[in-house]
A protein has these predicted regions:
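Structural detector of well-ordered beta-strand residues that form the stable sheet scaffold
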Residues: 50-52, 73, 101, 182, ...
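Conserved active-site segment immediately N-terminal to the catalytic lysine
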Residues: 51-53, 57, 63-92
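Conserved small/polar residues in nucleotide/adenosyl-binding loops
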Residues: 243-249
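Active-site C-terminal subdomain of aminotransferase-like
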Residues: 81-85, 91-160, 166
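Conserved PLP-binding catalytic core of the aspartate aminotransferase-like
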Residues: 162-169, 173-211
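Active-site phosphate-binding strand-loop segment of PLP-dependent enzymes
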Residues: 2-58, 79
Length: 250
């Protein structure tokens, strides 16, 4: 296992690397990796490429087939609005599906699940990746949360999220508070997440939450904000920026 700096990823892709695993948007900084380019580099070196879409599904246009990604995984409780405990998902490229064996076996992934055969025989296609009985309440919540996506243009959503995050950064820049931007300044190199470093970040975020403005803290000193145009607008950005001004940073 080799962990490298985000800016050095492409320099370390060579024929000694068998598998490349990346989060499309870094969970700390929001930095976006070029999925298509990195996947191509990986394939040229003979590596498989696995993408984690936890911080991009629901806010960025994702084109796994176009990028020729081998595998992808993600969650639905973030920007897909499935809520706590909602199901995860997995993608396997068609050229791999017949060769893949699930690491976790479950009766829902069995070829004939209701025969209750003592010998496991995997189903065909992506169905074999199912495990056991799901939480029906979580599935029901997710089903309704996903209904809205049929009528949403992801490219338009992405542009709107850039507008919101740019507005937020510009408003924070005007304030005389000790917040240091750690996300890329260029909006096309970050997801819809904006992160700052702050010495007393945990206490500061708790104070924001008390004002019903919910961001996130990650050790040792990062505070994170996500901007989904599905439920946020410009007035929300102005409100949270003004609240920053009224809160102490120490």
């Amino acid at each position: 296992l080799k962990i490298v700096k985000p800016e050095d990823i492409t320099e370390h892709i060579n024929d000694e690397v068998a598998v490349i695993m990346l989060t499309e948007a870094d969970y700390r900084t929001g930095r976006i990796y070029d999925m298509k380019n990195i996947t191509q580099l990986g394939h040229r070196s003979g590596a498989l490429v696995i993408w984690d879409l936890a911080h991009t599904a629901g806010v960025l246009p994702i084109k796994l087939s176009e990028a020729k990604a081998d595998f992808a995984v993600g969650c639905t409780y973030k920007y897909l609005n499935g809520g706590p405990g909602s199901p995860a998902f997995i993608y396997i490229a068609p050229n791999h599906i017949n060769k893949v064996e699930p690491a976790l076996f479950g009766w829902h992934g069995h070829k004939n699940p209701f025969e209750f055969n003592l010998n496991y025989l995997p189903s065909s296609g992506i169905e074999k990746m199912k495990i056991g009985s799901p939480s029906i309440i979580s599935f029901a919540s997710l089903k309704h949360a996903l209904d809205i996506w049929d009528n949403i243009d992801m490219n338009e959503l992405r542009l709107k999220s850039i507008e919101l995050s740019e507005l937020f950064i510009s408003e924070i820049d005007k304030l005389s508070i000790d917040l240091n931007l750690v996300s890329p300044r260029d909006p096309y190199f970050r997801g819809n997440q904006v992160s700052y470093s702050l010495e007393n970040g945990y206490a500061f975020m708790q104070a924001l939450i008390q004002e019903n403005l919910i961001g996130d803290f990650r050790s040792p000193n990062l505070i994170r904000f996500g901007f989904s145009p599905i439920y946020l607008d410009e007035q929300d950005i102005i409100t949270v920026s003004y609240t920053h001004l009224t809160l102490p940073t120490n």
